[in-house]
UniProtKB/Swiss-Prot annotation:
It catalyses: RNA(n) + a ribonucleoside 5'-triphosphate = RNA(n+1) + diphosphate. GO terms for molecular function: DNA binding; DNA-directed RNA polymerase activity; magnesium ion binding; zinc ion binding. It is an enzyme of class 2 (transferase). One of its GO terms (cellular component) is DNA-directed RNA polymerase complex. Binds 1 Mg(2+) ion per subunit. GO terms for biological process: DNA-templated transcription. This is DNA-directed RNA polymerase subunit beta'. PANTHER family: DNA-DIRECTED RNA POLYMERASE, DNA-DIRECTED RNA POLYMERASE SUBUNIT BETA. Mg(2+) binds at residues 497, 499, 501. Residues 1475-1499 are annotated as: Disordered. Its cofactor is Mg(2+); Zn(2+).
Length: 1499
């Protein structure tokens, strides 16, 4: 695709790009001549052959300003065309842009339009791909005009004929062939490209479209409708490319009384899909490269072009000598195949292979597609000049904004700047001599270099660049050696360590680039992580350890109990060696301080022999004039900013992180930078002073371990005994044993931690490293000194869940050493971790790429979209483990509606207020505020991009987000980066299973009164271990709810769903305390219980048919398990295994369906009591630690909006459940509401039903088990519900599985993009098509355009209007008034019907491909399909997103590239109006569609 048309220069300031199907005329207009020979260069002279594929006459000279024969040399002959060789004297660079062409002997079908799915040509001609192929490859004839002979034979246009049939007609009606080709009576049938071209020429698109629309409206057959819709889409795409020549002319004609003149269209004609001329791309894009030894490496395209030319020339010769039809036909077919291979060689099974190596040649399509294609390799990712890379080492003495740049690198990178300075200062006379100075490494150059780099920032980048902090700017400092030096605090942002990592250096050259690097990218301006708003420059490892060591307390240290007048005295005393670093001392200090309550215990530091002193100190402490602290903390306070309170507690990593966040928000980045540098220095210094190192003796195994292990072995033996006697099933035994060991592991883990804590007064080096957060986790400490515990089995379990837990734990720890068997079991996890890492990194990277592509054009485009919508944030949701707190979700958002305190009924916040950190903190403490409606990206009404108010504050700065901020890209980075990080982190666990003791006792989190809803209970008697009888209330109704209510206000504090089978420990109306037991649950299985006393009857429970007896190999005990009988039984009489509960007289009380995998716990005919267990359904408990390996596929599943593999059946209405009859293998579940609206759901038998007969369900409640499909939520509860569901579910994976904090607004940005489209259901009177996916805003615009218009049903005596067309109501009214005056028949009309649509949830891949911009979509995936579709439609790309602009080489329309910033006018006349954005630019921005400067691309 080239842009130069004829000789006109390329327009550089274009604002949009249009793509269309190239007509033969446009190919010829771009061509500089016809390529006639297949030769490339002469083998003797190595000069291009004339008229060949490299011809200088066509493509331009190979040497600058020199013609082929050498008659004209030098630039003075510029533009002259040599009379001898015909070559234009010009720069050789034109060989990159000049095109040629090949005139084909017969028309050839373009493979893209024929092989695309659905086939464009097939859709227009209503032919299947098979049929088309037979015509195109010269197997059958197709009738183009039946003429007289055809009519006699009963042939119609488009009928296919074999060779025999064709020649039979030709011979039978010989005279007919003498008629003129245009004669309607002449019989014409052709094959190949000619036939297709002739058929396409005869197509009338308008009447085809009308006919297809008629079929859509009138046809009864669904299949016919679907086919018509498929064809109509292609027809309408072609029609869309036909723009009327001028809107004004059209308007003028519409109501004039003269007949309209015929329209002149400039659009894609269907026959353009068949080519008579093919373009030859410029030779520099398919070069011949000389290798040593006189051989040449050639681009594959040259081979492909050569085949086309050879076959074309041979065909021309054969036509000239009038060769037999058979030979001609074969040659034409070969030409078609050669052109197919040139355009797309990868689609065909028999692709053209290269001669020497057996690989397929790279065709034009292949050079666009994929990672190595033109888009991704050359346009989106370019190599950069002025860059270098080297290994990094730590630079502990650097300031935060500095980095160390090796001198040798610096002189190379800044060479042009240095040369200029050397010449200016007179060190060198010319550039050449300056270069020599540099090569000689003359001492003079170093001073010059120092001056040059002063104030010239450089950018450092570490691959993989997962988020924007992967590239930061620094002020370079020249260093000796060859390694870059990096500040230790920026390592977290780069995810760098110093084990051999390399980093790249880039130099911003222009003044603007340097400014942006200084202002926006300097490392000291990027202290906060954009993904969560938390600081990223946090001390780690040695620094944390140093600061932790510094602030620790040691009892009995030298100088403890001393009282100092001020902090300066403390420092002097320490320097003089009078007090130790960790001594507990008292200092007179009356400013604010941040301390824990344990400082009163410091009074012990004063000996008991001095009671007066003790008493006085205590009084002073209570009066807050004296402060109990340590020497180290005073030293730390010396580096603190003055306005921050004294930190009087031990600083571990978490406290340090919070402190840094506090400092940044209070004193700003400049002061914070100094503070961070000081903390770094102090940390390293103290880590050195402390001399911390760990030895073998520091890992202390707790004494109590043996006792706990003994106990656990006893318990597990007891469980095995119970299992042997048949009291437990295999599954229950497994789960119970796992629980026992999990408990012991946790206890031993705590014990070992406490042992370390007590050792040496908490100064055990291993403990300090763990406790400070410098290195290692509690889990690793457990493995070192406790016990390794249970290990996960890496392969999939029986139930298909990843990784079960091996029930024999590893009892040893790494300090004691493992036995051979234990070591072997351990290797499992370690190896799995390493293999996972390499596999999952690619997945996470691909997820990031899709996220970027879907969100790349979400930019902040306006200040306020004016919507009143928003989303609700409720307080009670925060109780779920790992969820973000209520006030954290509000921080940095704007309020949508007034916030009212439900207790005092006062307005706390007004609509439009920003919730700052302080306000969020107030809301957290104000219990009266339970529900806040905030503005959200999900409900933003901006036409393009989003508005600043809906987005809230920029997390990285804490201020309102600026116009032009590329929030979509930031969102994609924020979600993608942790995904990659987490997958890289799985193997640190070493496969040790953690977590997962199933919750068996549920306790109250609040104090209050209980209120039961829908809870039905029965009393059940059980016997405990001693044989004593116990009575329990057992819940026998699903979906029962227990509320904890504040008795004073009546407000519900907590709402909990009580599971079926729960053992209640409380009654309705009870007062409960915080922590009191509410109910117990069986964690490993769900029971099926008898509701009343009675007798049991088994129905359809037959041995070997619906259940099998599984005897355990070890115990021989038999379990009865319901099996999947549907797959085996084909007899009609089996319905479904169920247990009936009868009275003693045989009357039915209840019937319980028993699902597959359930274990029977009762006997046929036995008497049971209310609450007895009839059967148990085991839960698949595969409890394994937080490892995002399970999480990443879940995130992908949610972002791709895939339906889960085993979806739940969901109720669509509120109503009461009843069970219907059984059909085949399905059971009917009916839900009926108060308005007699009934829905029937068919549930496969054996799937566990969660509701009982008579239960009340709400719309959206699941009826069966399984995951709820997001599509169902969208259908039943609407877009808002599904948006919230997706955001919450993705957050769950990140927070609970991985402990990563991502702000909701990033997820909202992506989810918004997934719901941007609607699907047209009924097109009404618009030009839309049913089933079309279009943008919400476009859909609204289309409907608003036909408002106030009417559709003419009968035109009466009016002339210039069409029936069925739309016109403005006033115009028709005016026309009717005129007609009434003249007593003519009036126009009858009806109002225009708007289109209707439904919201669609698209996965991120399809959403990215559905983008408005074809350039962006083509560079993402399915390049050829996207380009084909766009070309047919004649699409225009307005270059609104980021990606399109990068591809065409313009500044991106975000950040400083926004139109409003680029058209600033700077003037100095009067300082007050020194700059003003032009008003026009502000309004129209980059997004206004401009009429001028369009570039056309032809396929």
């Amino acid at each position: 695709m080239a842009f130069a048309i004829g000789t006109s220069p390329i327009k550089r300031d274009f604002t949009r790009i249009k793509i269309s199907v190239a007509s033969p005329e446009s190919i010829l207009a771009r061509s500089r001549g016809e390529v006639l020979k297949p030769e490339t260069i002469n083998y003797r002279t190595y000069k291009p052959e004339r008229d060949g594929l490299m011809c200088e006459k066509i493509f331009g000279p190979t040497k600058d300003w020199e013609c082929y024969c050498g008659k004209y040399k030098r630039v003075r002959y510029k533009g002259i065309i040599c009379d001898r060789c015909g070559v234009e004297v010009t720069s050789k660079s034109v060989r990159r842009e000049r095109m040629g062409h090949i005139s084909l002997a017969v028309p050839v079908v373009h493979t893209w339009f024929f092989r695309s799915v659905p086939s464009k040509i097939g859709a227009l001609l209503d032919l299947s791909t098979k049929e088309l192929e037979r015509i195109i490859y010269y197997e059958v004839f197709v009738v183009i005009n039946p003429g007289e002979p055809g009519r006699k034979q009963g042939l119609k246009m488009m009928d296919r004929l074999t060779e025999e049939q064709y020649y039979q007609i030709i011979t039978e009606y010989e005279d007919n062939q003498d008629l003129d080709d245009d004669d309607p009576d002449k019989f014409v049938a052709k094959m190949g490209g000619e036939a297709i071209k002739a058929l396409l020429k005869r197509l009338d698109l308008d009447s085809t479209a009308k006919e297809l629309r008629r079929i859509l409206k009138e046809s009864q057959s669904e299949q016919k409708k679907a086919d018509a819709l498929k064809r109509l889409k292609v027809v309408e795409a072609f029609r869309a490319s036909y723009e009327p020549y001028s809107k004004e002319a059209k308007k003028k004609e519409e109501f004039s009384l003269e007949p309209p003149e015929p329209y002149r269209y400039e659009g894609n004609k269907p026959e353009y899909m068949v080519m008579e001329v093919i373009p030859v791309i410029p030779p520099e894009l398919r070069p011949l490269v000389p290798l040593e030894g006189g051989r040449f490496a050639t681009s594959d395209l040259n081979d492909l072009y050569r085949r086309v030319i050879i076959r074309n020339n041979r065909l021309k010769k054969l036509l000239d000598i009038r060769a037999p039809e058979v030979i001609l036909r074969n040659e034409k077919r070969m030409l078609q195949e050669a052109v197919d291979a040139l355009f797309d060689n990868s689609r065909k099974a028999n692709a053209v292979k290269s001669g020497d190596s057996n690989r397929a040649l790279k065709s034009l399509s292949d050079s666009l597609k994929g990672k190595q294609g033109r888009f991704r390799q050359n346009l989106l990712g370019k190599r950069v000049d002025y860059s270098g890379r080297s290994v990094i080492v730590v630079g502990p003495e650097l300031r935060l904004h500095q980095c160390g740049l090796p001198k040798d690198m610096a002189i190379e990178l800044f060479q042009p700047f240095v040369i200029r300075r050397l010449v200016e200062r007179g060190y060198a006379k010319s550039v050449k001599s300056a270069k020599k100075l540099i090569d000689r490494k003359d001492p003079a150059i170093w001073d010059v270099l120092e001056k040059v780099i002063e104030g010239h920032p450089i950018m450092l980048n570490r691959a993989p660049t997962l988020h924007r902090l992967g590239i930061q700017a620094f002020q370079p400092v020249l260093v000796e050696g060859k390694a870059l030096q990096l500040h230790p605090l920026v390592c977290t942002a780069f995810n760098a360590d110093f084990d051999g990592d390399q980093m790249a250096v880039h130099i911003p050259l222009s003044q603007e680039a340097q400014m942006e690097a200084m202002m926006l990218m300097l490392s000291s301006h990027n202290l906060i992580l954009p993904q969560s708003g938390k600081p990223v420059t946090v001390p780690s490892q040695d620094m944390v350890l140093g600061v932790y060591y510094l602030t620790k307390v040691r009892k009995g240290a030298r100088g403890e109990g001393n009282i100092f007048a001020n902090t300066e005295d403390v420092v002097i005393a320490y320097n003089e060696g009078e007090v130790d670093l960790h001594a507990r001392i008292f200092v007179r200090y009356d400013k604010p301080r941040d301390e824990k309550n344990d400082v009163l215990s410091f009074i012990d530091a004063i000996p008991e022999s001095k009671p007066e002193k003790r008493k006085w100190v205590k009084e002073q402490l209570e009066a807050k004039t004296l402060m109990a602290t340590t020497v180290g903390r005073v030293l730390f306070s010396q580096v603190m900013p003055e306005t921050i309170s004294f930190i009087n507690k031990v600083l571990d990593k978490k406290t340090a992180k919070d402190l840094i966040a506090h400092v940044i928000s209070k004193v700003g980045t400049v002061r914070a930078e100094k503070f961070l540098d000081d903390v770094k220095g102090l940390g390293f210094n103290m880590a050195m002073r402390g001399g911390l190192s760990i030895g073998l003796s520091d890992a202390i195994v707790p004494e109590t371990k043996k006792r706990y292990i003994k106990e656990a072995i006893k318990n597990s033996n007891k469980i095995i005994k119970e299992y042997n006697t048949g009291m437990l099933t295999e599954n229950e035994k497994y789960n119970k044993i796992v629980d026992v060991w999990q408990n012991v592991t946790n206890i031993v883990s705590d014990e070992s931690y406490q042992t370390l804590r007590k050792d040496r007064d908490g100064f055990n080096p291993l403990f300090m490293m763990l406790d400070s957060g410098a290195r290692g986790s509690r889990n690793q400490a457990r493995q070192l000194t406790g016990m390794r515990g249970l290990i996960a089995r890496p392969q999939k379990s029986m139930s298909g869940q990843p990784g079960e837990i091996i029930e024999n734990p590893i009892i040893s720890n790494l300090r004691e050493g493992l036995t051979v068997l234990e070591y072997f079991i351990s290797t499992h996890g370690a190896r799995k971790g390493l293999s996972d890492t390499s596999l999952k990194t690619a997945d996470a990277g691909y997820l990031t790429r899709r996220l970027h592509d879907v969100a790349q054009d979400v930019i902040v485009t306006e200040d306020d979209c004016g919507t009143t919508m928003g989303i609700h944030i409720r307080r009670d949701e925060e109780e779920v483990a790992g969820k973000v707190k209520f006030h954290d979700k509000l921080r940095g958002r704007y309020v949508a509606h007034d916030v009212v305190d439900s207790i005092t009924e006062q307005v706390v916040l007004k609509a439009g207020d920003l919730i700052t950190d302080e306000i969020a903190e107030e809301l957290r403490l104000n219990v009266g505020v339970t529900d806040v409606m905030i503005r959200s990206v999900l409900t933003c009404d901006s036409k393009r991009g989003i508005c600043a108010k809906c987005y809230g504050t920029n997390l990285a700065s804490g201020r309102q987000v600026d116009a032009g901020e590329a929030v979509g890209v930031i969102a994609a980075q924020s979600i993608g980066e942790p995904g990659t990080q987490l997958t890289l982190r799985t193997f640190h666990q070493g496969g040790a299973a953690q977590g997962g003791i199933a919750e068996t006792e549920i306790r109250s989190q609040y104090e209050g009164q209980l209120e039961f809803e829908n809870i039905q209970m029965v009393q059940s008697k059980t016997f405990n271990e001693d044989g004593a009888e116990e009575v329990h209330d057992i819940v026998i109704r699903k979906n029962g709810v227990m509320n904890i209510v504040d008795p004073s206000t009546g407000k519900i504090l907590k709402r909990m769903i009580v599971p079926y089978g729960a053992k209640m420990n409380c009654k309705d109306g009870d007062m409960v305390q915080k922590g009191s037991l509410l109910y117990g649950v069986e964690p490993n299985s769900t029971p099926i219980l008898a509701e009343k006393d009675g007798v049991i009857k088994f129905v359809d429970i037959e041995k070997g048919v619906t259940y099998k007896e599984e005897s355990d190999q070890q115990t021989g005990h038999v379990q009865r398990v319901i099996i999947n009988w549907r797959s085996r039984v084909r007899t009609v009489d089996i319905r479904e295994p169920r247990i009936q509960l009868l009275t003693h007289h045989g009357e039915l009380i209840a019937s319980y369906p028993i699902p597959i995998k359930a274990n029977l716990h009762s006997e046929d005919g036995a008497t049971v009591h209310a609450g007895d267990v009839l059967a148990k359904v085991p839960r698949d408990l595969t409890r394994i630690g937080g490892d995002i390996t399970a999480g990443l596929p879940r995130v992908t599943e949610l972002f791709e909006a895939r339906n889960p593999s085993d979806p739940a059946v969901v109720s669509e209405i509120d109503g009461i459940v009843t069970f219907g009859s059984q059909r085949r293998n399905n059971k009917e579940v009916k839900v009926k509401n108060a308005y007699d609206d009934e829905r029937i759901y068919l549930v496969p038998i054996g799937k566990h039903i969660l509701v009982n007969e008579g239960d009340e369900v709400r719309a959206g409640d699941p009826i069966t088990d399984g995951s709820i499909s997001p599509q169902d939520i969208l259908r039943i509860q609407g877009p808002n519900a599904v948006q919230q569901y997706l955001v919450n579910e993705i957050q769950k994976v990140y927070q609970i599985n991985a402990g990563v904090e991502i702000n909701d607004k990033h997820l909202e940005v992506i989810v918004r993009q997934m719901l941007q489209k609607v699907q047209v259901e009924d097109s009404g009177d618009t030009h839309l098509m049913p089933g079309d996916l279009i943008d919400k805003t476009t859909f609204k615009d289309v409907n608003s355009k036909i408002q106030g218009k009417v559709r003419v049903s009968e035109k009466g005596d009016a002339r210039n209007i069409q029936e069925g067309e739309l016109y403005a109501k006033e115009e028709i009214g005016r026309l009717n008034r005129e007609l009434r005056k003249n007593n003519r028949v009036l126009v009858t009309f009806e109002p225009a019907v708007p289109a209707t649509s439904r919201p669609v949830l698209l996965g991120i891949t399809s959403a990215a491909l559905q983008t408005e911009s074809f350039i962006s979509a083509a560079s993402f995936q399915e390049t050829t399909k996207v380009l084909t579709d766009a070309a047919v439609e004649g699409k225009t790309d307005f270059l609104a997103g980021l990606k399109e602009n990068v591809i065409v080489g313009k500044l991106i329309p975000a950040g400083t590239g926004l139109k409003r910033y680029r058209s600033l006018r700077i003037s100095t006349a009067n300082l007050q109006d020194s700059y003003e954005p032009s008003q026009r630019a502000y309004q129209e921005d980059e997004y206004a569609k401009k009429e001028d400067g369009e570039i056309a691309i032809d396929d």
